[in-house]
Amino acid sequence: MHLIEKIYKNTREVVTREDAERLEGKSDIKSYIGIEPSGIPHIATAVMWPRKLAEIQDDIKVTVLLADWHAMINNKLHGDLDLIRKGGEILRKTFQAEGLTKADYVWASDLVDSSEYWRMFIDTAKRSTLKRVIRSLPIMGRNETDAEKDFSMYLYPIMQVTDIFYLDVDMAFGGMDQRHAHMLARDIAEKMKRKKVVSVHGFLLSSLKGNARMDNFVKMSKSDPNSAILVTDHMEDIERKINAAYCPPQQVEGNPVAEIMKYIIIPYYGKSIEIHGSNGVINLDSVENFDQAYQRGEIQPADLKHKVATILNEMVEPARRSLEGLDLSEFQ
């Protein structure tokens, strides 16, 4: 598989594809993903992303920014920086266990020790507006009302853009919820006459509980353990959560169990996937094949749930095993 195909694989959006294709053949491509350490991660963070990035780590330099300062601003783990750092070690261990062994793991607190970082921060801030920063607050799951009570939240989008510039990356990875920050970085880069970062946006996984309305997306969140599969969950936990999950028949959109099959298992399991169907065994060799079979009713929700729980337990096992013996009571 060519590099550009690996980048496009299992992505919701690439901004822009033309910019991405111009990077092909470049020998020293640098990329990053920023993750807030905030406790025990769920599968969208610590299974999907490390496996995605592991596929390109031989071709591209990958940096995982353990965004401890960002998590502190966002009041993750009550803003306790020591506890956030412990959460960052959990991220590093799980990412490496899931295959991302060649990445550089960098702390935001190391970046901010540099006066050059803060010079870039000020240069970046001078090329943005308060209105644009407010529009970017959803990247941290916040809004203007939250920021009015805590001014530090206004710094967050500018810090994220500064991270991109300071690390001098060609490519930024993240969920669709990071789009505002990446677009802000591209706009400010144009004003600075510097390279625009290629923004690669992955899918967000829906809450296992489903969404009340199709236009009201609720993502999987570790703050609600019953909405998410955590990397510490054992087989019985995974089975219980998947069996209780929203999974309407013949509907893949807004179906969290179908999303796990489409965005984690089929792209990254790496083995043949066979599932019981109404007309016999179905080989799920592509997302398109799964979509068609499920929407036609050839795969029943109960069979899908059984297959997803079984394979997901296997895929979570490396991350789960990497945390054995650690005291995780502070994150329960």
Swiss-Prot record:
Gene3D superfamilies annotated for this entry? HUPs, Tyrosyl-Transfer RNA Synthetase
Q: Which organism is it from?
A: Thermoplasma acidophilum (strain ATCC 25905 / DSM 1728 / JCM 9062 / NBRC 15155 / AMRC-C165)
Gene name of the encoded protein: tyrS
Q: Which UniProt keywords apply?
A: Aminoacyl-tRNA synthetase, ATP-binding, Cytoplasm, Ligase, Nucleotide-binding, Protein biosynthesis
Tell me where on the tree of life, at the top rank, the source sits: Archaea
- Residues at which ATP binds: 222
Q: Where in the cell is it found?
A: Cytoplasm
Record-level GO cellular component terms? cytoplasm
Taxonomic lineage is: Archaea, Methanobacteriati, Thermoplasmatota, Thermoplasmata, Thermoplasmatales
Picking any one GO molecular function of the record gives: tyrosine-tRNA ligase activity
User: How is the quaternary structure described?
Assistant: Homodimer.
Enzyme Commission no: 6.1.1.1
Q: InterPro entries annotated for this entry?
A: aa-tRNA-synth_Ic, Rossmann-like_a/b/a_fold, Tyr-tRNA-ligase, Tyr-tRNA-ligase_4, Tyr-tRNA-ligase_arc/euk-type, Tyr-tRNA_synthase
Q: Which residues bind L-tyrosine?
A: 32, 156, 160, 163, 178
Q: What class of enzyme is it?
A: ligase
Q: Where is this motif: 'KMSKS' region?
A: 219-223
Q: Name one GO biological process term.
A: tyrosyl-tRNA aminoacylation
Kindly provide the name given to this protein in its UniProt entry: Tyrosine--tRNA ligase
Cite the Pfam families for this sequence.
tRNA-synt_1b
Q: What does this protein do?
A: Catalyzes the attachment of tyrosine to tRNA(Tyr) in a two-step reaction: tyrosine is first activated by ATP to form Tyr-AMP and then transferred to the acceptor end of tRNA(Tyr).
- Catalytic activity, as annotated: tRNA(Tyr) + L-tyrosine + ATP = L-tyrosyl-tRNA(Tyr) + AMP + diphosphate + H(+)
Q: Which family does it belong to?
A: Belongs to the class-I aminoacyl-tRNA synthetase family. TyrS type 4 subfamily.
